[in-house]
Amino acid sequence: MNADFLGLLLLYLTILLCAAPLLGRHIRQAMNGERTWLTAWGQPLERGLYRLAGVDPAAEMDWRRYAVAMLVFNVLGVLAVYALQRLQGWLPLNPAGLPGVAPDSALNTAISFVTNTNWQGYAGESTMSYLTQMLALTVQNFVSAATGIAVLIALVRGLARHSAATLGNFWADLVRATLYVLLPLSFILALALVSQGVVQNLDPYVEAQTVQAQQYETARLDAQGQPMTGPAGQPLTDTVVTRVQTLPMGPVASQEAIKLLGTNGGGFFNANSAHPYENPNAWSNLLEMLAILLIPAALCWTFGEMVGSRRQGVAILAAMTVLFAGFAASAAYFEQQPTPALRQAEAALLADGGNLEGKEARFGVAATALFATVTTAASCGAVNGMHDSFSALGGVTPLLQMQLGEVIYGGVGSGLYGMLAFAILAVFIAGLMIGRTPEYLGKKIEALDMQMVALVILATPALVLAGTAVAVLADAGRAGVLNPGAHGFSEILYAMSSAANNNGSAFAGLSANTPFYNVLLGLAMWFGRYTIIVAILALAGSLAAKPRLPASVGGMPTTGPLFVALLVGAVLLVGALTYVPALALGPVAEHLQP
């Protein structure tokens, strides 16, 4: 770790934490239906959408109706995205003439984008038409993020209300989050990215003649244009030599903006934010990192204002920031170390370079390590370098942040409702230690509440570890591993952790675009998203129905340093210890290998 990284981290956190209160206040006003600076143009459109859908925004729902509405909306989203992918060969805005996507890949991608995961087993520029990118994937980038915000707001209402039976209206929350939060921010960010060189057009791909011949491996396709696999399920490839380079075009900036602001992460291009058309320079890189954590940080402020105590939100934000800074420093330290080859050559510990494998020269080690920490602290998954090329211990940072449940800032909405589950757990543990009935924000924490909290915390580890075991035991799972041994195990563990925790990034050495992995990861994404959401809504309904208790002497304060420390400890101990055996078999074993 050097001065470059420390300066970048300090600049990043300063801008982020200064912007969070301003946006957080705006989100609170928008989600409560109060007047904002966007009301003049947004309210007529909002009312028109309600009339078109036949929705009464004032008709509130209990937690069960809220959950059913959310699930129905998301199931319809999966069907729409699947259909657009399968039919894209016959639809317009397809200048490259790309065929329909294979059924298993289309299903995996549909689940991926609807669940806010954006896991991509395909290369966007060679698989998806412009229409599919815009109408299917970009639309889901908006509404999946809005779903996360809506569920969080429902939980916050459950904490803020007392003796109540309802949590709000899902349709109203969905529309307001999209119209007043996501759309305006995305418009501003898209313009900023275009100013830095991110492409935004509907032009056909450009073919350029190169001076030197290029040789690369490409997937072998069958008569229907779908990837072929061998007898053991391994992908088949062909070697291609060419002097023609195809430069992909497309409406990149508009998708890039919501990909980041909605903590979605799915890139327009296969290289994601390492591609110069998505992330051209250091300024665009800083903007993209800020966009990823802006709304998750702001929602902490929204939470504090909605429950009537800003200090409650600041305490949660402080715990997130402490964890984030520690993981960022860890990633930078291990990536700045010499690679084994450099160490054998007796390179200086802090010599220029460090582990530059898999990193863009225009970003370097510091910006790549920070971006990796940002994208896995959030459930984003966008990358500006190759995580598979991180050192064994450097790769632990993005892996472990996902395994903690994506609560260090976390995804839009999902990060904070996950962290609030840990906050309730921390209060429960404190209550056991001092022999008092646990309370949080004046609500008594009872058996049903702790059952839902336990489900939120344990659902994803169960999916990750069970899925990893299935992949390791199955022939089709092992066939996708291109790097056998400890690192190959890490690649499978990373893929399952990313899918179940709705992150979407990858150790890309795993060949995951096969029927086996498309189905396995699709199931992990679906249940990793909606098991937790339903449990959170049940928790919100339980809390809303409780009377508010007056503050008692000797109660656990939830706004001071002691609570922050207890919350950080709960996240690390309960979240991280679950994965110690798996981490020992993967990155730790790889690090200890000679």
Curated annotation (Swiss-Prot):
Keywords: Cell inner membrane, Cell membrane, Ion transport, Membrane, Potassium, Potassium transport, Transmembrane, Transmembrane helix, Transport. The keyword ATP-binding does not apply. It is a multi-pass membrane protein. It comes from the Bacteria. It is found in: Cell inner membrane. Pfam families: KdpA. The chain crosses the membrane at residues 3-23, 67-87, 136-156, 179-199, 287-307, 314-334, 415-435, 453-473, 519-539, 562-582. One of its GO terms (molecular function) is potassium ion binding. GO terms for cellular component: plasma membrane. InterPro entries: KdpA. Its main location: membrane. Belongs to the KdpA family. Part of the high-affinity ATP-driven potassium transport (or Kdp) system, which catalyzes the hydrolysis of ATP coupled with the electrogenic transport of potassium into the cytoplasm. This subunit binds the periplasmic potassium ions and delivers the ions to the membrane domain of KdpB through an intramembrane tunnel. The system is composed of three essential subunits: KdpA, KdpB and KdpC. HAMAP family: KdpA (MF_00275). This is Potassium-transporting ATPase potassium-binding subunit. The gene is kdpA.
